[in-house]
Amino acid sequence: GESTRPGAEPVPVAEEIRRVVPVIEALAVEGALISIDSRRAEVMRAAVNAGARIINDVSALSGAGALEAAADLGVPVILMHMQGEPGTMQDNPSYGDVVAEVRDGLLARAQACREAGIAAKDIALDPGIGFGKTVAHNLALLAHLDSLTATGHPVVLGVSRKSYIARIDRDVPPGERVAGSVATALAAWDQGVRLFRVHDVAEHRQALAVY
């Protein structure tokens, strides 16, 4: 309902709800497992009431009322790390130790979730590749995903077609980044990641099945 890509502008809450609820209701009828990607408590409540069963928040439930809403709704959550806001997060991302800071930031949010009543088994962590990070930051995180899998929380990885692949390989357009996406998924699998957010489902499924 609201894009969180670099440079994206916010969408009013009512408009976000208008966009997502009919789609969720239609998918829920078909028995699909649906995740709502939102930073807003009101959208989370409307989406879960419409049939969503997972909350994915790029701001790790740090927005007004978001943590309380997730706890009240009693569904699993995905906490993503993001430095800054979508509109400006890529302007000048800076870390002392990106691996440690992302891990510790996510663990702090996971602790807040547990204190709010969300079970540890229902909390997944996402390092937020491309969200307030340079290519060097992204590559460091990808090389040390085991720092997150070692926490015991499920780890979710979203790298499909992202721009770091183009920075490495001739600035190829999104449609030509499938091989790089699959390669990253295989490397992440070796570090214990089991949940992947992808565009090209068949290609990733086949690669992981063979691997």
Q: What do the predicted segments below correspond to?
A:
Residues 116-118:
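Short coil/turn linkers that connect adjacent helices within long alpha-helical scaffolds
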Residues 4-33, 39-42, 48-49, 53-112, ...:
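Active-site-adjacent loop and "lid" segments of alpha/beta metabolic enzymes
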